[in-house]
């Protein structure tokens, strides 16, 4: 795997300055804490989420502090309605309400944000590996149309990772851990604040051989921000992030291999030294202007990214995305109004080479790709009576994708295609008491195809060309639910039903080539998203989530009413935390009673499974903690994820095994 650490020298210098600056100032502070941040940002996020008439969740750093945080799965496992299954390393399948259901690589159907600014590329695809959850103060999950405040009109909604500031995370914080498969991880962060200026920065490094052959990973990351109070009414914050991620790809296995020898790698993946290596640098700004009854936020970003991705060929892309956004929030009496817009414009130099054991061979393809996605959104909230809010809003989005082929060893064509859609939303929020809410909404979503869907290699002989009849995926979703607290119980339950037209579905053509995409006619996604926490005593807490997912075709000409593959109908997770912050242990369970289908023909279903784990932590000294994370205690062999095919058979290499037994332990400290 290649290394680019030499480009990180300026970032190391900046982080060192940040680490040194607060040390002496913090020595005068008698209070010490082990958590990364103060809860102020998280509390504010929870207050905003509580005003949303639909499924939302805020996950604080404390909720996953004892875990070995490798991917988003480690942070959002107990967020209701979020389906996450690890494949290897930081690669996970992430889906909400069946979003991007058959996309087994990169990501589709969700808007990913960091500090409120999308990290999705201009064609709306993205790499979730660029979100490093170990840096975050908290994560905000807005499911479905409830993500309107972020300008998202996708089926799945939005996930926003929020980093600390110098005011919420003063001092120096250290975290280090080691574990199975030669895993080593470390984090150092520092924050400092003055009267009108604050700064925060962090560096993380990670290395592991992986729990499968040919699954080594290496990463080096930096995050930082500087905030300025320009006046009593105007503040601005500048953000910078750098990612150097090197990940070998072990590939998918046959059913028999996944259930008997899950450690092995796919033969083609190993022979081709398949990898996904990402270098990215992101700069962004957010400026806030207080106008009295209204608040205006505006800003922009630039993201430079390099992708080196040997698979069936070596994909070598260099892209630059720029964008801007603005949002106005107004509140006066019983009326609240949000108006906003954003635009993302990107260009990429996309090349492909013959894969010679993971190295570039002869050039086979060279194209210039351009894309733009823009949206305007608005939402009005009216309280006709004290405990009832009525909400109406909508998102208008348009975009285009364009490709110009400079060279191709096989037939390939230029092309350009555009899309637009309006997605309205209507909802209500009723609060029968101060601690109970009942909500309902009805909304439309629209998802535009990305480059992988717009330009496909099809036919015999294969031709890479514009698929002019590819359509946006559209859906109407009805949702009703409740959240609240009563006695020892805190609950969050939502029922949803989405009727889709043109769902973008994919099927694997072979083990190394990314899937082909087609628009289904009519499909149905319906289910239950439930979370129930029981605070039995100060030293005893039970966390539970349950998801019921019924995804199927509707009178399809080829597949009838078959179930859609990949996501199981039932999934239950539970964690029982016993003890206090001084000493605690938390056994956990992930249970899938019956696995999902692996194909659209519904010929093959994977077996169910139950995975047991445990985490624990203790306070060693003031400001110094130790923690341990044990996964898959029994060494269960099971299938965790699938790359869907039209009709599976015994030779289909489409299965990813669950994580093997692993143990890690670490320490964290604040000075």
Where are the language model's segments positioned?
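Gram-negative outer-membrane beta-barrel transporters
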Residues: 385-390, 398-399, 496-499, 518-600, ...
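N-terminal periplasmic "start-of-domain" segments of outer-membrane beta-barrel proteins
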Residues: 31-67, 92-93, 110
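Short acidic/polar hinge/loop motifs at secondary-structure boundaries
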Residues: 110, 117-143
């Amino acid at each position: 795997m290649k290394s680019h650490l030499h480009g990180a020298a300026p970032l190391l210098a900046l982080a060192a300055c940040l680490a040194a600056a607060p040390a002496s100032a913090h020595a005068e502070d008698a209070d010490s804490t082990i958590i990364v941040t103060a809860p102020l940002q998280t509390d504010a996020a929870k207050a905003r989420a509580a005003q949303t008439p639909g499924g939302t969740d805020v996950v604080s750093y404390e909720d996953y502090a004892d875990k070995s945080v490798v991917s988003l799965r480690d942070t959002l496992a107990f967020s209701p309605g979020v389906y996450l299954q690890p494949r290897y390393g930081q690669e996970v399948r992430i889906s909400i309400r069946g979003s991007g259901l058959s996309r087994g690589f990169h990501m589709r159907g969700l808007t990913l944000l960091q500090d409120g600014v999308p990290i999705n590329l201009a064609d709306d695809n993205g790499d979730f590996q660029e979100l490093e959850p170990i840096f975050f103060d908290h994560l905000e999950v807005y499911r479905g149309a409830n993500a309107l405040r972020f300008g998202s009109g996708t089926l799945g909604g939005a996930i926003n990772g929020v980093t600390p500031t110098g005011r919420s995370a003063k001092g120096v914080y250290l975290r280090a851990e080691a574990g199975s498969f030669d895993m080593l991880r470390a984090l150092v962060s520092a924050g400092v604040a003055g009267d009108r200026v604050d700064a925060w920065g962090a560096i993380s490094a990670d290395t592991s051989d992986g729990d499968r052959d040919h699954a080594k990973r290496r990463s080096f990351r930096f995050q930082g921000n500087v905030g300025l109070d320009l006046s009593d009414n105007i503040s601005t914050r500048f953000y910078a992030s750098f990612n150097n991620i090197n990940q070998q790809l072990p590939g998918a296995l046959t059913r028999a291999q996944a259930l008997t020898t899950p450690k092995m790698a796919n033969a083609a993946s190993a022979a081709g030294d398949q990898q996904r290596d990402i270098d990215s640098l992101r700069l962004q700004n957010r400026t806030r202007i207080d106008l009295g009854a209204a608040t205006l936020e505006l800003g922009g970003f630039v993201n430079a990214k390099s992708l080196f991705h040997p698979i069936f060929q070596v994909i070598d892309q260099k892209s630059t995305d720029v964008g801007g956004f603005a949002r106005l929030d107004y509140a006066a009496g019983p009326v609240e109004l949000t108006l906003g817009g954003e635009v993302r414009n990107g260009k990429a130099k996309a090349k492909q080479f013959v894969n010679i054991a993971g190295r570039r061979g002869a050039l086979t393809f060279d194209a210039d790709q351009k894309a733009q996605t823009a949206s305007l959104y608005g939402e009005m909230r009216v309280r006709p009576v004290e405990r009832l809010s009525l909400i109406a809003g909508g998102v208008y989005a348009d975009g285009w994708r364009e490709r110009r082929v400079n060279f191709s060893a096989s037939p390939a064509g230029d092309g350009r295609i555009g899309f637009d859609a309006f997605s309205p939303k209507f909802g209500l929020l009723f609060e029968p008491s101060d601690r109970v809410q009942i909500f309902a909404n009805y909304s439309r979503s629209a998802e535009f195809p990305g480059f992988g869907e717009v330009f496909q290699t099809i036919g015999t002989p294969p031709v890479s060309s514009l698929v002019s009849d590819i359509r946006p995926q559209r859906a109407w979703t009805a949702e009703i639910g409740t959240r609240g607290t009563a006695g020892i119980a805190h609950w969050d339950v939502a029922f949803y039903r989405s009727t889709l037209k043109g769902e973008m579905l994919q099927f694997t053509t072979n083990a190394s080539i990314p899937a082909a995409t087609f628009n289904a006619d009519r499909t149905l996604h319906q289910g239950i998203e439930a979370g129930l926490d029981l605070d039995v005593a100060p030293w005893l807490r039970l966390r539970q989530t349950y998801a019921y997912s019924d995804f199927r075709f509707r009178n399809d000409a080829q597949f009838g009413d078959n179930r859609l593959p990949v996501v199981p109908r039932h999934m239950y997770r539970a964690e029982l935390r016993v003890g206090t912050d001084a000493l605690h242990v938390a056994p956990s369970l992930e249970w899938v009673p019956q696995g999902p289908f692996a194909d659209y023909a519904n010929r093959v279903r994977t077996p169910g499974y139950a995975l047991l784990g445990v985490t624990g932590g203790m306070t060693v000294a003031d400001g110094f903690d130790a923690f341990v994370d044990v996964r898959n205690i029994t060494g269960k062999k099971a299938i965790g994820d699938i790359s869907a095919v039209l009709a599976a058979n015994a030779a289909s290499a489409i299965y990813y095994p669950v994580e093997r037994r692993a143990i890690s332990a670490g320490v964290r400290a604040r000075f």
